[in-house]
């Protein structure tokens, strides 16, 4: 099995110079040419940042709405009551509730990809931190998932909102579309994501902020993108 995977990766990586940097348009073409899996692979981006992840004040976190969506049907849960619950439902939320939703999640039933909460619900939702936190879906004010404007938050989530957060090695990973997208739409999503990460640069970060940008598909190899393709 391992040999089959290795052989496949060798075939996919043919024609790619691992030490070279490619323009964004060329990188997208190469990525799509090598996406040969029998499903619509996700276009993934990895950004190596010049931050010290050991310091909390250099954490990079935010949210960006992909201009062309992500190609994923996102299920949204909203912790809200009364009129805010009605607004969430009307905006298209899949699950809406208060104490009842709390009990469902506490019991381990998490049938959603994104979680939104009104501020008054956070004392309750905060008790679910050990469940929602590790999954990266704990409502957070900084990424707009703790809000009184639940309708807008739901619509943005449904239309392609992507959360990002730097990891221990100072790297950010995210899925930003599907290989079935038109090349231009993938490029636009990449540019939007990179721009959002650049805007989220910590004021205390020193030196070069964006060190490397790499694109890949779910089953593909990494393709390094020339930073001159971006305003970094």
From Swiss-Prot:
UniProt-listed GO biological process terms: regulation of translation; translation
Transmembrane annotation, as ranges: none
Presence of the UniProt keyword Coiled coil in the record: no
InterPro entries: Ribosom_uL1_bac-type (IPR005878), Ribosomal_uL1 (IPR002143), Ribosomal_uL1-like (IPR023674), Ribosomal_uL1/biogenesis (IPR028364), Ribosomal_uL1_3-a/b-sand (IPR016095), Ribosomal_uL1_CS (IPR023673)
Keyword field: Repressor, Ribonucleoprotein, Ribosomal protein, RNA-binding, rRNA-binding, Translation regulation, tRNA-binding
SUPFAM superfamilies documented for this protein: Ribosomal protein L1
GO-annotated molecular function: rRNA binding; structural constituent of ribosome; tRNA binding
Quaternary structure annotation from Swiss-Prot or TrEMBL: Part of the 50S ribosomal subunit.
Family of this protein: Belongs to the universal ribosomal protein uL1 family.
Function of the molecule: Binds directly to 23S rRNA. The L1 stalk is quite mobile in the ribosome, and is involved in E site tRNA release.
Protein name: Large ribosomal subunit protein uL1
Organism name: Liberibacter asiaticus (Citrus greening disease)
This protein's encoding gene: rplA
């Amino acid at each position: 099995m391992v040999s089959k995977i290795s052989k496949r990766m060798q075939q996919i990586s043919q024609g790619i110079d691992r030490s070279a940097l490619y323009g964004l348009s060329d990188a997208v073409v190469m990525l799509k040419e090598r996406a040969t899996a029998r499903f619509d692979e996700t276009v993934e981006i990895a950004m190596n940042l010049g931050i010290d992840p050991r310091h909390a004040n250099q954490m990079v976190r935010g949210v960006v709405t992909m201009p062309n969506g992500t190609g994923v049907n996102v299920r949204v849960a909203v912790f809200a009551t009364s009129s805010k619950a009605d607004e969430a439902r009307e905006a298209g939320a899949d699950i809406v509730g208060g104490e009842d939703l709390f009990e469902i999640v506490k019991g381990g039933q998490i049938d959603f990809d994104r979680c939104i909460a009104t501020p008054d619900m956070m004392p309750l939702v905060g008790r679910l931190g050990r469940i929602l936190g590790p999954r990266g879906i704990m409502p957070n004010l900084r990424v707009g998932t703790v809000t009184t404007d639940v309708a807008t938050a739901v619509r943005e989530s449904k239309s392609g909102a992507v959360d990002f957060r730097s990891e221990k090695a100072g790297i950010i990973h995210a899925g930003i579309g599907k290989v079935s997208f038109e090349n231009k739409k993938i490029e636009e999503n990449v540019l939007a994501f990179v721009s959002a990460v650049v805007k989220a640069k910590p004021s205390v970060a020193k030196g070069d902020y964006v060190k490397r940008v790499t694109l890949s598909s779910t089953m593909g190899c990494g393709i390094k993108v020339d930073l001159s393709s971006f305003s970094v």
